[in-house]
């Protein structure tokens, strides 16, 4: 090894070690000036010898060349969100759901940590070196932000030690400490630049800079909270012990993280953090509670978007008084008419709130609210503004009643309210401009067709100018037509056309979700695709066939049937296919034709000790069974584990065959 190469190795090792001591252990061992001197020496040597550059060099923290755009990253294991609890009752319900499913949870410890108000990221380490960082995105697909993340000094570019897996994905939160946020805004104020509203926005904006040199100037920090991919090695079977392993490898862990042994201790942890919230160095909006035993986590499994073994216990919403100046009625993509309160702007929970939903006519009546009232505004879970009560003693004499419209405020079609539903809807369908706009916005959204650059304002202009009326019209647009829109030059117009062409290659679940069928979310769209395997089969399905799909009940099935029964919807679908929208063909898993389960409609209920519900479902489907989420007269058999509830009772009432876990294992052999 040459003298220069040896010195570079020494400098990188020294700077890595001191970086961990300073940013992770909060125990600096050399003066800042000495650290800066070593960094300058490293930069000078690397500039003089670019052939000796290393991907894990501490010098990368100063940022690299600007990017044209962020690349997409598909998460090998989805980054799910968490369900929320807002009071002790909801926390207890969460605990009861787990113990009903797996009684052993009663004897498990819980790992508790503050819920940081930042941005979730994924860090991939290969042979100990940080090779990729990505945002959470929609949970399935995020953005590659590796260059930006390398500038965050508390994130190690190379792990310490040697006992880590060869591939290890670390997940955590990037945030901006309060002191750093205040200093950043003070500098912006001094320079006459725009200030950030809150630390979370500042962190998110900093991470999404195309120029990593800007990110490098922002005071960002990181705490790890879980792992994803683990290959070529093993981690502890305790969530808390995994934290200690990560810390040993140089990754920062929130110092408030605590292991507790009972629900009472969980509540005590919550109260302690709540009382100390303002004194913490970072913004939080609750605490996260996780079952500590990794095997129990695996047995509990997941629902569509969240794990069953973890929950976010949110802090009480922050409330303020303000005036209700007016109420506007907005029309959504399914025709739902929502009253929106126009408020005197008020700062609540870190943001200025000027609008709040009043939900529907029933909610207005329940609140007894009138225009001109002083109202209590709350950001539930520090996120969604809502009016929770009226200060009646402050009601002015000229307060006005809120009258729900009988005609659509946009297209003047009749407003209808189906018996048993709280929501009133415009009956205009696609002749209603508001519904067209919202349907198109949904169609191009990230979780649907994911058309980059086709934002809300562009959609509104396209509809207002009568350039599009259905989703298929979007794919008929030409770049030259788009340049008449505001802030749409030739390059931007071509980018939109390129994005539309790229979006033509999609998946059947995304296409179904993009159609905007009432109450058909991502999970239902995925179930439909996996059940029917083709669009043609879905288009021709009966109500009874829709009900056979896992987690599709009578209400959703009726919405599906009504949607595909309308000629105009079928016409739009055909036009989209004519424009070249395609997706990979789906095939059913190989089925053993002599299986006793082939073609049977099966329901799983209760908890199983020898395999997870997801594993049981997959094994049953591989043998040709159709696994559904509810018991009906069409169900052939029910497999009941421990603590089986209403599904078992209904199966018994209907005279359906019920088998225990051991019988399930025998069927699967």
Swiss-Prot record:
The keyword DNA repair applies. It catalyses: NAD(+) + (deoxyribonucleotide)n-3'-hydroxyl + 5'-phospho-(deoxyribonucleotide)m = (deoxyribonucleotide)n+m + AMP + beta-nicotinamide D-nucleotide. Its cofactor is Mg(2+); Mn(2+). One of its GO terms (cellular component) is cytosol. Keywords: DNA damage, DNA repair, DNA replication, Ligase, Magnesium, Manganese, Metal-binding, NAD, Zinc. Its EC number is 6.5.1.2. NAD(+) binds at residues 32-36, 81-82, 113, 136, 173, 290, 314. It comes from the Bacteria. GO terms for biological process: DNA repair; DNA replication. CDD domains: BRCT_DNA_ligase_like, LIGANc. InterPro entries: BRCT_dom, BRCT_dom_sf, DisA/LigA_HHH, DNA_ligase, DNA_ligase_AS, DNA_ligase_CS, DNAligase_adenylation, DNAligase_N. DNA ligase that catalyzes the formation of phosphodiester linkages between 5'-phosphoryl and 3'-hydroxyl groups in double-stranded DNA using NAD as a coenzyme and as the energy source for the reaction. It is essential for DNA replication and repair of damaged DNA. This is DNA ligase. It comes from Vibrio cholerae serotype O1 (strain ATCC 39315 / El Tor Inaba N16961). The lineage of its organism: Bacteria, Pseudomonadati, Pseudomonadota, Gammaproteobacteria, Vibrionales.
